Amino acid sequence: SAQFKNSEKEEFFYGEHSYVLQGKFKVDSYSKHAAGRVTFTHVPSDYDEFEAIYQVLGKTPHGTAAMMPMAMEIYGRNREVGEKCIRLLCYPSNVNTVLSLLKDKFGSQEGFTSDDGYHQRYLPAAVLEGATPQNGYNPTEPYTVNMIASVNKHQDMQLYDGRVMYIYIMGKGWDTEQRSIEIVKTSTSELCQIFNCPALLTQCKRIQGTWNGLK
C-alpha cells in the first residue's frame, strides 16, 4: 500500500468525529504514482456534517472521491438526507443516475435490510479497507478509503471550462478491485464534484456472514 509522509496528512474534527486526508492528487497535473487515503471514525451523522466535511475534502480530487461511500451510506439510512448529500457531492448530470442506481440496489425500505442476493444495503462498505465478502463486509476501524491514480490522464471538458480526473478506489467487493470514479473541477467552483461513478454502484460479491452496519 502507498506510503504517506506526515506532511501530507490533514486531520480535522466535527464534534467527536475525526477525518484524516492524505495524498497528493492534483487537479492541475497528472501523476501515475498519485495515491490518496481518507480515514474517518464515523459516517457523517446528518447533512450539516456532510456539508461541513465536503467544504474540506472537496478541495481535493481524492477527498471528494472518498465522500461517495459516505453519501451512499447516508442514503441507505435516510433517503431524503442522502439525496441532499448526493446533490451536493455529484455533478448535476450525474445525480439522477446515482439516485436511480441506489434505489435499485437498496430497495424501497430505508435503514438496515438483510441481503436477498440482489438488494445490497452493504454496498457502501465494499470499498472500505478490510471489508470482504467473507467477513460480512465489516471494515477495519477507523474506516479507510484507499485510492490510486487511474491509467487515464486528466481530460479537459469540451463543453465547459473544467477538467475531469480519473481515480481508482480500491475495494475487495469485486473481482476487479480497482473501482473507477471520475472527479470534475470547473473553473467556477472551488470544490470538486463526482462526475461519474457506476463502478461503485454495481452488484458486488454476495455476502457471507452478517453485515453489522457502519457507525
Predicted regions and their residues:
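Residue-identity detector for glutamine
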Residues: 3, 22, 49, 55, ...
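Surface-exposed, charged secondary-structure patches
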Residues: 2, 98-172
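Short beta-strand edge/turn micro-motifs at domain boundaries
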Residues: 1-32, 36-38, 164-168, 173-215
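Core segments of small alpha/beta cavity-forming domains
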Residues: 15-127
